[in-house]
Amino acid sequence: EEYQQIFKTRLQEDSKAAGRWNTSDGGEYFAVGVQGAVTGRGADLLIIDDPHSEQDVNSPSAFDNAYEWYTSGPRQRLQPGGRIVLVMTRWSTKDLTQRLINAQSNENADQWEVVEFPAVLPNGKPVWPEYWKIEDLNSVKASAGLAKWNAQYMQNPTSEEGALIK
């Protein structure tokens, strides 16, 4: 009820599917997974949530497939003036986030505002100290290995070789 007091829009009575529903004011929600078909649809807002899995780290073609899906599917469906939100765990220097960041070196390509939340801030304090104590984060870092730590916790993927100090 609190939601309904703030937002007057309602779901249409016949909207029952979790991955697709319409509002009484003409809005639509449509969800697919990576590699899912979006042909014939337009979008004012695209939200891409975790296009990679942990298993993708061991499959370079999975990163290529996700990028190909994005560029030939969802990106092509974005209406003029539309927006894209990409929320993901960083996994690799070849993941979708890195590919999009690299592409923006072309001034005509999509330009992204990147918002990152590293587990440990430059001042050495946890980004979320109420949940993660620095001692716990240091334990994760020591247990996970530097490459995983840099990618998943610090939002700064490196190759396994790049994570080693020689």
Report the location of each language-model feature.
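Conserved nucleotide-state-sensing and coupling region of NTP-binding domains
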Residues: 1-38
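A glycine-rich helix N-cap at a beta->alpha junction
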Residues: 2-10, 117, 121, 128
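Short, conserved catalytic or adaptor-binding loops enriched in Gly and charged residues
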Residues: 12, 20-24, 103-109, 142-143, ...
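Active-site donor-binding loop signature of nucleotide-sugar glycosyltransferases
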Residues: 33, 117-119, 155
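A short acidic, often aromatic-flanked loop/helix-cap motif at beta-alpha or helix-coil junctions
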Residues: 37-39, 121-126
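A short acidic, Gly/Pro-enriched loop at the edge of an enzyme's catalytic core
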Residues: 42
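Signature of the SF2 helicase/ATPase Hel1-core->accessory helical subdomain module
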Residues: 45-122
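ATPase catalytic-site recognition across NTP-hydrolyzing enzymes
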Residues: 124-166
